[in-house]
């Protein structure tokens, strides 16, 4: 089993802070102009009244007034708010230090580019080989060793007294020879009986 993961690019966060004066830069999030080249409206009641009366009621919207107080409503810019870096939350992914309070920040744009390519190849090979033992048959058990066939009558008196077993006929009727063959015949009979019992 093999598992391979190919990560082409890790998630990255890039931020850009525009310092000092900016000339009508368009934000990628809102699409509004946040440049500082626009003029502040004079915060006095007469200018506010003149400005409001010069506009038609259909053109007056939430961006024209942030409160009912004329002195505070037009001290706020309609498109962007002037602030400094120390007053906001830093979302900078770099290790640079935050700018001083004298430097204004117009915009922080985020681009979250995530590209993960995963290739999972599962190669499995299973090989099973089984071999069963064959049962031993009785014929295979018996044919393992071929012993000479035992003849019960091989130790007869004629065989014992045969001249071929004597040394030039010297011990033809030797008593020890008779006892030996008699003992051998009894041992063969016992062996044959044991084989039959098995």
Curated annotation (Swiss-Prot):
Has UniProt tagged this entry with the keyword Zinc? no
Give residue spans, biased composition: Polar residues: 91-104
Question: Residues that bind Mg(2+), according to the entry?
Answer: 92
Record-level GO BP terms: viral genome replication
- Main localization, broad class: host cell
Q: According to the UniProt entry, which residues carry Phosphoserine? A: 67, 154, 156, 164, 166
Q: Span of the secretion signal?
A: none
Q: How is it modified after translation?
A: O-glycosylated. Hyperphosphorylated on serine residues, when in dimeric form. Phosphorylation by host CK1 is required for the hyperphosphorylation of NSP5 dimer.
Which controlled-vocabulary keywords does the entry list? Answer: Glycoprotein, Host cytoplasm, Magnesium, Metal-binding, Nucleotide-binding, Phosphoprotein, RNA-binding
Protein name as it appears in the record? Non-structural protein 5
Organism of this sequence: Rotavirus A (strain RVA/Cow/France/RF/1975/G6P6[1])
Q: What is the lineage of its organism?
A: Viruses, Riboviria, Orthornavirae, Duplornaviricota, Resentoviricetes
């Amino acid at each position: 089993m093999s598992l391979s993961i190919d990560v082409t690019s890790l998630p990255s966060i890039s931020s850009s802070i525009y310092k000092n004066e900016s000339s009508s830069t368009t934000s990628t999030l809102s699409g509004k102009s946040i440049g500082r080249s626009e003029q502040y409206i004079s915060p006095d009641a007469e200018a506010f009244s003149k400005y409001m009366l010069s506009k038609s009621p259909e053109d007056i919207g939430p961006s024209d007034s942030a409160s009912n107080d004329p002195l505070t409503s037009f001290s706020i810019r309609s498109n962007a708010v002037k602030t400094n870096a120390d007053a906001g939350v830093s979302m900078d992914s770099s290790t640079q230090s935050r700018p001083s309070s004298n430097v204004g920040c117009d915009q922080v744009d985020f681009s979250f580019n995530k590209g993960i390519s995963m290739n999972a190849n599962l190669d499995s090979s299973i090989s099973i080989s089984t071999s069963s033992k064959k049962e031993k048959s009785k014929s295979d058990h018996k044919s393992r060793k071929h012993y000479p066939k035992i003849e019960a009558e091989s130790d007869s008196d004629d065989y014992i007294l045969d001249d071929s077993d004597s040394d030039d006929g010297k011990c033809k009727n030797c008593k020890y020879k008779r006892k030996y063959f008699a003992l051998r015949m009894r041992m063969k009979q016992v062996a044959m009986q044991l084989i039959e019992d098995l």
